[in-house]
Design a protein with these regions (language model features):
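Pyridoxal 5′-phosphate
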Residues: 1-393
């Protein structure tokens, strides 16, 4: 496997030419010029030819994007839906699995995304219980403990694969094997995974998987994708419907028999054109090569951070993603983010709300987070470390 041409990636990314050091793809990544061009081209077509008329060309691009997403996830194109955000995708699938009732059990990892937990509130009000799967000694969700929790009342197993507050990689495939063995629906929040590391929905044994377009896929904001296993569609009854998701037939309005039952007829073809280009770029580069590069860069950053007095890392697990969570003694994480931003170095910062169960369990009020892209280079790392040393002093 040949390494990525990092210089070419940087030259094809306007943000890398602007003087910004971007260590925040876990929030949103820098798009390529080609992705920007795809968005602008569709908008220009709408302005020139008429929005509805240009929609025919846009629809072709959306189907091209759907095939690219299927290729990336090892899924049929018909199993892919596009939505406006990852949280929207997850919430729609969760609500469609209802109705929820008293006694239903929802098993989640301790690192669950806060937005997903918020979407469960309606089920909780109906009498369902959200229960946390115990972690193993490394801090990862434990498949053995999960297996011991299973009974006839478990209606959903839900896992955030790569948490937003650290480098943990949860054992998504092993969790999926437990779910499959017991015949329990299994949802994966892969918002931090898709575009960063290889994702094979067949190997994961998941029924639903979602990801935002703006993170490691390097697509535009306002886009997301969702995989729905074809054989699982019959168990999902979306509350929100329109003429696309439930088209008119001689017998009345009928839900589609593919993942597009979760789409709406009103979409931004321009944004989806950009997402489509980003998906094609990920496929061309090869996510295995992207992941190899991310592992190399993040290992160097972790090593450098450990050498700075006053910095504490918050990694769990044995293998780590390209997200490095840390704190610098004497600094609020959000103020640290702001001060680095003044030096044109972008990082992230999280409070409790994004991953409340894990943050509370570890007594963390906030964390600073550095996340990496394949286009980050040695100069980026040097700038980050030098700035942190300067602020510490």
């Amino acid at each position: 496997m040949s390494p990525l041409d990092v210089q070419h990636l940087r030259e094809a990314t306007p943000g890398c030419q602007s003087g910004i050091v971007h260590f925040n793809p876990a929030g949103a990544s820098l798009p390529s010029q080609a992705t920007l061009d795809a968005i602008i081209d569709q908008l220009q077509r709408e302005a020139r030819d008429g929005p509805m008329e240009a929609g025919e060309h846009g629809a072709v691009l959306v189907e091209k994007a759907r095939r690219a997403a299927g290729q990336l996830l090892n899924a049929p194109a018909s199993a892919i839906a596009f939505t406006s955000s990852g949280s929207t995708a997850w919430s729609m699938a969760f609500q469609a699995l209802g109705p929820w009732q008293r006694g239903d059990r929802i098993l989640v990892g301790r690192h669950e995304w806060g937005g997903n937990l918020a979407s469960m509130e309606g089920a909780v009000q109906a009498g369902a219980r959200v229960e946390v799967i115990p972690c193993d000694d490394t801090g990862a969700v434990c498949p053995v403990a999960l297996d011991a929790m299973i009974d006839a009342h478990v209606k959903l197993i839900d896992l955030t694969w790569l948490p937003a507050n650290g480098g943990l990689i949860n054992p998504a495939q092993a969790i999926g094997e437990v779910a499959r063995r017991h015949g329990i629906p299994y949802f994966i929040d892969a918002g931090q995974a898709v575009g960063q590391l290889p994702v094979d929905v067949q190997a994961l044994h998941c029924d639903v998987l979602k990801s935002a377009g703006r993170k490691h896929l390097r697509g535009p904001r306002g886009t997301a994708l969702m995989y729905v296993r074809p054989g699982f569609l019959q168990h999902l009854n979306p509350a929100q419907r329109d003429v696309l998701s439930a088209p008119w037939t001689a017998e009345g309005f009928d839900l589609r028999d593919d993942a597009r039952r979760f789409e709406t007829s009103e979409v931004s073809f321009a944004l989806l054109a950009g997402l489509g280009n980003a998906l094609q770029e990920a496929n061309r580069l090869g996510v295995e090569r992207i992941w190899e590069r991310v592992v190399q860069i993040s290992a160097r950053i972790r090593e450098a951070l450990r050498e700075i007095p006053g910095i504490s890392l918050h990694d769990l697990g044995t293998a780590h993603s390209g997200l490095i969570a840390f704190n610098l003694a004497g600094w609020d994480a959000f103020e640290l983010k702001r001060r680095l931003g003044l030096k044109r170095i972008n990082i992230g910062a999280n409070g409790v709300a994004y991953t409340p169960l894990d943050m509370q369990a570890r007594h963390l009020a906030s964390i600073a987070r550095v996340s990496v892209s394949p286009f980050n280079n040695a100069q980026d790392i040097d700038s980050l470390i030098a700035a942190l040393r300067e602020l510490r002093d």
